Regions:
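Accessory, usually C-terminal, subdomains that scaffold auxiliary metal cofactors
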Residues: 190-241
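Phosphate/adenylate-binding glycine loop and adjacent helical scaffold
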Residues: 1-197
Length: 241
């Protein structure tokens, strides 16, 4: 039986190969594909630096700029978007074949919900809405779910902002809440060692960490943000019925 870890590694390798084939160099052990995919729906407005720095949450603005530059030099955002769609269909067929038919059938109802959600303050959600909706029924259903995910994510980041967390600090709290290896998430999102160290100092100054570890207060804040995110993002499921 294949373990979830080995499946994830296989998926990562397959996904990375898509971007290597487009001559996208590897960054921090992975491709710049994550930044490129997230931003694909927002180009060309991302040429404005302030948007790059404000909409990606705890992802390093420098990493975002690097990924943008790599895409512009070696491929197009449309090709990156298409490669992701191809990988999604292949991954669903291989790892979750049982949801293909339900996802295709639910697509129209999901889009009906998506179209009724408020857009104010939801940058990624609104940007994804401007992208063409796939003709493939399965992929269309997946894109609708992805829009719901982005709507939740935008809502969550509003709460992170309200908690006065910025830079690598949200990644540090989330990293501890999930139980990842220390500083893995901040590093994977492009933060430098100095930036991460400064974030630790800021968290300790607020009583959210001590001696290089997120403490109970920090974990409680992260849990409260998650609970409030759940409360504020119940609307799609209420509309779906």
């Amino acid at each position: 039986k294949t373990s979830s870890a080995s499946r994830s590694k296989t998926d990562e390798d397959r996904f990375t190969n898509h971007f290597v084939s487009m001559k996208l160099p590897l960054v921090h052990g992975t491709s710049g594909s994550f930044f490129a995919l997230c931003s694909g729906s927002q180009t060309p407005v991302w040429e404005q630096t302030t948007l790059k720095e404000s909409a990606f949450g705890s992802i390093s603005p420098k990493g975002i700029a690097l990924a943008m530059d790599l895409v512009e030099k070696h491929t197009t955002f449309q090709d990156v978007w298409a490669a992701r769609d191809e990988a999604v269909l292949a991954g669903l067929a291989e790892h979750a074949p049982g949801i293909l038919e339900p996802l295709a059938k639910m697509g129209p109802d999901l889009w009906s919900v998506v179209d009724r959600l408020p857009r104010l303050g939801r940058v990624f959600f609104a940007a994804h809405l401007r992208m063409p909706r796939p003709a493939d029924a399965v992929l269309s259903g997946w894109h609708a779910v992805n829009c719901l995910r982005e709507w939740r994510g935008d809502t969550h980041w509003a709460l992170v902002t309200a908690a006065d967390l910025s830079g690598p600090a949200p990644s540090i709290l989330h990293n501890a809440w999930i139980g990842y290896e220390k500083d893995w998430l901040a590093t994977s999102r492009g933060s430098t060692a100095d930036e991460t160290a400064a974030a630790w100092d800021a968290l300790e100054a607020r009583g959210l960490a001590a001696d290089g570890e997120v403490n109970a207060s920090g974990l409680d804040l992260r849990q409260r943000m998650e609970d409030e995110t759940d409360r504020l993002t119940a609307l799609p499921w209420t509309l779906l019925g």
